[in-house]
From Swiss-Prot:
Gene3D superfamilies listed in its UniProt record: Winged helix-like DNA-binding domain superfamily/Winged helix DNA-binding domain
NCBIfam families per the UniProt record, alphabetical: HTH_metalloreg (NF033788)
DNA-binding region(s), chain positions: 37-61
Keywords, in A-Z order: DNA-binding, Transcription, Transcription regulation
Gene: yuzN
GO molecular function, one term: DNA-binding transcription factor activity
Name used for this protein in its record: Uncharacterized HTH-type transcriptional regulator YuzN
UniProt keyword annotation of Transcription regulation present: yes
PROSITE patterns from the UniProt entry: HTH_ARSR_2 (PS50987)
Pfam family, one: HTH_20
A biological process from GO: regulation of DNA-templated transcription
Residues making up the signal peptide according to the UniProt record: none
Domain HTH arsR-type: 1-92
Organism: Bacillus subtilis (strain 168)
């Protein structure tokens, strides 16, 4: 579990990754293109889809983001279970 905790904290340690999670928690099941457009327009970020894909890889390694095929698109899904499990140990 410690390795997973480290991965979660690493993932949350970057402001862009936190914005990605904010967007996915607000509107789950976004494509990479939709997520990129939302980040650029809402937060005035200067970021490419390739850079977002790298951030998503870190979030996926931490278990915070998963993806699934929906038709011809791959949609991104926020998974808050790792955060709940992490906090459960400290709060309970």
């Amino acid at each position: 579990m410690n390795g997973n905790k480290d991965a979660i904290f690493k993932a949350l340690g970057d402001s862009t990754r936190r914005l990605i999670l904010d967007e996915l928690s607000e509107r789950n099941e976004l494509t990479l293109y939709e997520l990129t457009i939302r980040l650029i327009t809402k937060y005035d970020l200067s970021i490419t889809r390739q850079a977002i894909a790298k951030h998503l890889s870190v979030l996926e390694d931490a278990g915070l983001v998963t993806s699934k095929r929906k038709g011809k698109y791959r949609v991104l899904i926020f998974n808050n279970e790792p955060l709940k499990n992490l906090l459960k140990g400290w709060i309970e």
